[in-house]
């Protein structure tokens, strides 16, 4: 059976949060009496200032699945440290067979990333970044790998605190 997956990412803004729908999958459960159709939606929500969340919702209808996914996004917000519209340093993230590499970029570069990663960067507030994905191109795995990378990035202050030095000593 063919996959139902719109390539268009929808965007909405509610209560200051940016919402993006990444994928909608049509799923089928085969039972004795025939097939039962359902839908699964993957969405991300962010405030454009470093907070981002992802969610997956399932239902018999698309709007209900998207609504459930958006609610889960708002429950699972995480804070990401940003530096002038980019990240502090290069970082890698993994989930399942998907792995991503994120590299900071100078102002004016834009978001150089494909598919689901681009949606995450847009809602979190990153304007300049270079990203590369390896392995699985499954949207769910790519979003989780991107979250893994963003959450594992550290600020210079955190590195200095771990080493017991000042921030100036880290850059010297």
Swiss-Prot record:
GO terms for molecular function: rRNA binding; structural constituent of ribosome. GO terms for biological process: translation. The N-terminal domain interacts with the head of the 30S subunit; the C-terminal domain interacts with the body and contacts protein S4. The interaction surface between S4 and S5 is involved in control of translational fidelity. It comes from Paracidovorax citrulli (strain AAC00-1). Keywords: Ribonucleoprotein, Ribosomal protein, RNA-binding, rRNA-binding. Residues 17-80 form the S5 DRBM domain. Disulfide bonds: none annotated. Signal peptide: none annotated. Part of the 30S ribosomal subunit. Contacts proteins S4 and S8. This is Small ribosomal subunit protein uS5. PANTHER family: S5 DRBM DOMAIN-CONTAINING PROTEIN. One of its GO terms (cellular component) is small ribosomal subunit. With S4 and S12 plays an important role in translational accuracy. Located at the back of the 30S subunit body where it stabilizes the conformation of the head with respect to the body. InterPro entries: Ribosomal_Su5_D2-typ_SF (IPR020568), Ribosomal_uS5 (IPR000851), Ribosomal_uS5_bac-type (IPR005712), Ribosomal_uS5_C (IPR005324), Ribosomal_uS5_N (IPR013810), Ribosomal_uS5_N_CS (IPR018192), Ribsml_uS5_D2-typ_fold_subgr (IPR014721). Belongs to the universal ribosomal protein uS5 family.
């Amino acid at each position: 059976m063919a996959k139902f997956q719109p390539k268009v990412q929808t965007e909405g803004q509610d209560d200051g949060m940016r919402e993006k729908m990444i994928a909608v999958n049509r799923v089928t459960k085969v039972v004795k009496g025939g097939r039962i159709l359902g839908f699964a939606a993957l969405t991300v929500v962010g405030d454009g200032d470093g907070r981002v969340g992802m969610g997956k919702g399932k239902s018999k209808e698309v709007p209900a699945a998207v609504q459930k996914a958006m609610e889960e996004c708002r429950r699972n917000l995480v804070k990401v440290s940003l530096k002038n519209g980019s990240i502090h340093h290069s970082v890698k993230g993994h989930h399942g067979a998907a792995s991503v590499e994120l590299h900071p970029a100078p102002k004016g570069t834009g978001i150089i990333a494909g598919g689901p990663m681009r949606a995450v960067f847009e809602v979190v507030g990153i304007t300049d970044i270079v990203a590369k994905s390896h392995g699985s191109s499954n949207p769910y795995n790519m979003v989780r790998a991107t979250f893994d990378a963003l959450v594992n990035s550290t600020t210079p202050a955190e590195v200095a605190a771990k080493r017991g030095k000042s921030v100036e000593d880290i850059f010297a």
